[in-house]
């Protein structure tokens, strides 16, 4: 069953400066494509109203109607393999790909490559726990800041998905509670509840796709959206969770979808997360859309 088949790893040791630094897992994947999927126009009732059947936070309320224009979105989040191409093409060194705020963040923090990546003997590796992995797998690119994702988009001449578009495809064009229908999320439908302790290949969990074939919208990694985090119309502070949202309006960037270590009750297309655009330590990645002609 492809939902439970995982990449085979081969092991060898590597020495750096005459010291054993780790066991490398050499990933021998067949690289998959990441095609764009056409999404028709429609309407979305974005956000939530009070519902006793699930936990709802104040930043989801209240719902409002949005018209969605036709767009084309990547089937999967951008993979490690795809992002490696950006790195190899001097994406971190070419100022033309970086916005003003992104450039300031990159230079101030001396960002020269993705977090946890190492360049050894002209080969890129990624560290995770006690292992070092060859970079270039079908895993989703994660631990990536909004600024880095923005630079990738500029280099590739694509754009971020926006928050309304993301919720639209994650609710089957506004028709269901989840991409796969109305059933609650489980470990069989998406990578959640920390079952596998890390993200998995983007081509797994076919049964969790939406009806258009967009994959892994729930779980595995959070996904950056284009917008700054702002309240919905008629927002009212929930004083039980009063520190969750309003202190960060106008500062953080939206991210959606949950990740492998998020509980099922927070894995929902309406749930809004937000992080600083320079955040790299969270398991956040991104998917992209074609620019309108």
For every predicted segment, state its role:
Residues 1-61, 91-270:
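Functional-site microenvironments in short loops/helix caps that host divalent-cation chemistry
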Residues 66, 71:
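C-terminal catalytic core of Y-nucleophile DNA break-rejoin enzymes
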Residues 282-293:
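Short, structured beta-strand segments at or near domain termini in extracellular proteins/domains
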